[in-house]
């Protein structure tokens, strides 16, 4: 990774932008389009490094995926005609690719090996392996917990599973495996987690029932799959950096168009509203994956907040930049119930606190979250993304609170989810 990026951006931020397509939905659209025999077109996909790993794996399985002017054209022979890969399936830095394909390839019964980069090699896989083994998947990891994951053919059975954590990746791994079982699967969630797999199964004609915290699948549901075109909304996790940047930078007025506001993902909007932030939604669309334009204006005197319970999974990927936002509130804020942050690209509880504390902010990590005190940017230490894309972008937003440039090591980690992040931030500076 490039060693160092100097961030020298000052406010106010003004203008109108779009953010890249939603990462979660792009992954799932590629997977489902690849399973369905025929041609599917995916419009405005995210073509960051994570989603490219998913594309490359399906190309090895025999799917043709063409990139053409902000769209992907996926031409698939259908899941029954997939090749057996003769090389390791490399998932890079992508936890979504690794965990969802663990379920999908187990269901398909394709002999394969999934392995990622050094960061993925440290991330626990037992939470996925346990339910898959209950489904009779023949899948093994190092110490039953780490990549590489070795998958061999087996006959998947349906299960009745009580989720141990509120994790969309674990839920989705089970759902993808269940497509191939002769029995129904019932999943009971602890809290509502992002439901893109469920909404997109329906979009590709796969029957699934979800009510409250219960999800029921249909036996051998894969036989119903049909190719479909899909328009990917802008990623609210990417929009979050601009939402916070506008809220904390005096004089700012930013509008972000075509952002996905699925209610299982829109926790940051709820949090900003509770803090008294100046945020407005308009141009709203309805449907399985609703969208809106979001206007954000600088807001002094933000109110402190406690983020806990069902709000946490709705904002899990945004919590590092939300923690930065909370430093600008008029009182102490708390994030609880966020143990899931420990198993992201880094332990985001620790990395968020460590990097922001280096810059003079005051955050105290806890076992399941953070205590965040009203505090200011005080010192121009060199900070480090630690190869975590969301930490890198959060630190770039923090630099707006400094009058001096800020150096961030390993900044090109942001390309995982947001190629072109820095030029877009500079565009708003120039318009301001």
UniProtKB/Swiss-Prot annotation:
UniProt-annotated binding residues for 3-phosphoshikimate: 23-24, 28, 167, 169, 317, 344
Function: Catalyzes the transfer of the enolpyruvyl moiety of phosphoenolpyruvate (PEP) to the 5-hydroxyl of shikimate-3-phosphate (S3P) to produce enolpyruvyl shikimate-3-phosphate and inorganic phosphate.
E.C. designation(s): 2.5.1.19
Keywords in alphabetical order: Amino-acid biosynthesis, Aromatic amino acid biosynthesis, Cytoplasm, Transferase
Pfam families in the cross-refs: EPSP_synthase (PF00275)
Listed InterPro entries: Enolpyruvate_Tfrase_dom, Enolpyruvate_Tfrase_sf, EPSP_synthase, EPSP_synthase_CS, RNA3'P_cycl/enolpyr_Trfase_a/b
Lineage: Bacteria, Bacillati, Bacillota, Bacilli, Bacillales
Protein encoded by which gene: aroA
Predominant subcellular localization, coarse grouping: cytoplasm
Annotated protein name in UniProt: 3-phosphoshikimate 1-carboxyvinyltransferase
Biochemical pathway: Metabolic intermediate biosynthesis; chorismate biosynthesis; chorismate from D-erythrose 4-phosphate and phosphoenolpyruvate: step 6/7
Active site: 317
Compartment(s) where it occurs, according to its Swiss-Prot or TrEMBL record: Cytoplasm
Catalytic activity: 3-phosphoshikimate + phosphoenolpyruvate = 5-O-(1-carboxyvinyl)-3-phosphoshikimate + phosphate
